[in-house]
From Swiss-Prot:
This is Transposase for insertion sequence element IS1557. Pfam families: DDE_Tnp_ISL3, HTH_Tnp_ISL3, Zn_ribbon_ISL3. It comes from Mycobacterium tuberculosis (strain ATCC 25618 / H37Rv). The keyword rRNA processing does not apply. GO terms for cellular component: peptidoglycan-based cell wall; plasma membrane.
Length: 444
């Protein structure tokens, strides 16, 4: 066939593919056209298992002729057409034969898959589907195939020393992913559906005992299910509790105390006389309980925010709380003091934490007394975070990016496609466009 090199380049195939014929088909209406290239593998790559690439004996003709979608030529769709017999693999049994232009179980060529994967990482959902003329679910399947191929060529657990572990909700009804990041490279290392001991155990199974022993630091949110697995699988690693989550415990305790004060004010308001319709008269009885409940309800953000971030109005609310409710203001000071502990860090931070625990135990606020006991239970991990300066900041930023990908990936059939998209985007192995690299080859 003439111009073989030209057609190989246009079709995105290599010398292992024989191009027998190329036809141009146009429908009667004239509003659609297709190019069909009839191809076959060279004898050197014939009769190989599509799953493992090993040579195998002939089994049957399979489903006969098959077509694989290739990249468009301008506005014309292009397909590769070839026989798809089956071989009898010693490992996998009857399996469709491997072809050098496409992945196993794929309806698209390497070039098409790689282009779609690059677009899925770099473009919007609408742009990918409109440009490539495929459904979004098809994009999910392609992304999963490309990541599976990429994963075989890389060692994502190489030089893993300091890791962060967290969970993220990816779907309603409490559907979670467990994610692991590398603190040194800043990359996503591993993700899987679920957030329990069994799920995290899968990570350490994939990592292996030898590499697990090389992990020196693990940061987490002090969840028991993470701490238990880490203690069992890499007992020599230093576990660090995330400072943000510890301060969040104090913020939650402060909000419990605010709601208590608000409910007390509402109870007083229920005993106060009710006003009739319209503007109250000059001689109407005051209702301080109702006014106090209203102001406490609106004070949540003034209590939550850092002092340097308060607006003028929120600062006024905080000053009002300090004057009218010493107990609630004391709870606020406890929260801010705990935040200060993690801003100083090191030995000074540990001494400040000792003083904070002593104060919280004597503060006569039950929720903060309980918080002091909780912090004492996790004291070793908190001290490690103060000593080594390790936090979940990196993994929280990764989670934010995964949440964005979750919205993009809406419509994928399974979480595996979402995980594949996240790995291609955040694991440091982003796909490249065909022609910019050597695409994966079947072993010979």
């Amino acid at each position: 066939m003439r111009n073989v090199r030209l057609f190989r380049a246009l079709l995105g195939v290599d010398k292992r593919t024989v191009i027998e014929d190329i036809e141009f088909e146009e429908d009667d209406a004239g509003d659609g056209a297709r190019v069909i290239a009839r191809v076959r593998p060279r004898s050197a790559v014939l009769r190989r298992c599509g799953r493992c690439g090993r040579k195998a004996s002939w089994y049957d003709r399979g489903a006969g002729l098959r077509q694989w979608r290739s990249l468009d030529w301008g506005t014309v769709e292009v397909f590769l057409e070839a026989e798809a017999p089956r071989v009898n693999c010693p490992t996998h049994g009857p399996t469709v034969v491997a072809v050098p232009w496409a992945r196993h179980h794929a309806g698209h060529t390497y070039a098409f898959d790689d282009t779609v994967a690059w677009l899925a990482v770099a473009c919007s959902k609408t742009a990918v589907c409109e440009l490539m003329r495929i459904a979004w679910r098809t994009v999910g399947a392609i992304v999963a195939r490309v990541w599976a191929d990429t994963e075989k060529r890389i060692d994502r657990f190489a030089n893993l020393r300091r890791i962060g572990i967290d969970e993220i909700s990816y779907k309603r009804h409490h559907r979670y992913l467990t994610v692991v990041v590398d603190h040194d490279s800043g990359r996503l290392v591993w993700a899987a559906p679920g957030h329990d001991k069994a799920t995290l155990g899968l990570f350490f199974d994939a990592l292996g005992a030898e590499r697990a022993a090389q992990i020196t630091h693990v940061s987490a949110d002090a969840a028991d299910w993470i701490a238990d697995v880490v203690t069992e699988r890499c007992p020599d690693a230093i576990q660090c509790a995330d400072p943000f989550h510890v301060v969040a415990w104090a913020t939650e305790a402060l909000d419990v105390e605010r709601r208590r004060a608000w409910n007390d004010a509402r109870a007083i308001a229920r005993t106060e006389p009710k006003w009739g319709r319209g503007r109250p008269g000059k001689n109407a009885a005051p209702r301080p309980g109702r006014e106090r409940a209203r102001r406490l309800k609106g004070a949540r953000y003034a209590l939550w925010k850092n002092p340097e971030d308060l607006t003028e109005r929120q600062s006024a609310k905080l000053a009002w709380i300090a004057k009218t409710d010493p107990r609630l203001y004391r709870a606020y000071l406890l929260k801010e003091s705990l935040r200060h502990v993690f801003s100083v860090k090191g030995e000074e931070g540990k001494q400040a934490l000792d003083r904070w625990i002593s104060w919280a135990q004597r503060c006569r606020i039950p929720v903060f007394v309980e918080l002091a006991a909780r912090i004492k239970r996790h004291r070793v991990a908190i001290d490690a975070a103060l000593d080594h300066g390790l936090s979940q900041g990196l993994i929280e930023s990764t989670n934010t990016k995964i949440r964005l990908l979750t919205r993009i990936a809406f419509g994928f059939r399974s979480p595996q496609a979402l995980i594949a998209l996240a790995m291609l985007t955040l694991a440091g192995h982003r796909p490249t466009l065909p022609g910019r690299h050597n695409h994966p080859q079947i072993s010979q």
